[in-house]
């Protein structure tokens, strides 16, 4: 199967070779399948990659939070508490760090999967797989992928699999931005 005269499997092999992540997204299963188009292939790669991520555990990081709450949590912002007269209402302005999966790495994946779910080119069975995986991303917010600064993302040995998956996501986002087709 080809996409604008390029065999789809060749695209997969080029990506896998470039990122040396071929084993982590279950190459043998993908090799034997036929894909009608590039988005169907990417949906399968993301489904496999996200399944692998879930087994490893989704990336978590500390995110700074600022809340007005009834009990002290983290650091008290005394100036805001006084200025807003929060103490009269038994409330405190607090700043703290939260260890969460709601970070840019997971937000990119969730938002890209939503793009794939809206594509007519993706087979129903693959959409079903992606929907099941989305249950694990309930705490993760969707973001506008057009605003992502892809080159500023940093990867280490603990989140290296994200680099391969994010390149797939970036390709999907860019192809949708510059697509001349409807949808």
Which positions does each model-derived feature cover?
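Catalytic core segments in nucleotide and nucleic-acid processing enzymes
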Residues: 183
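Terminal, charged accessory segments of proteins
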Residues: 1-155, 160-179
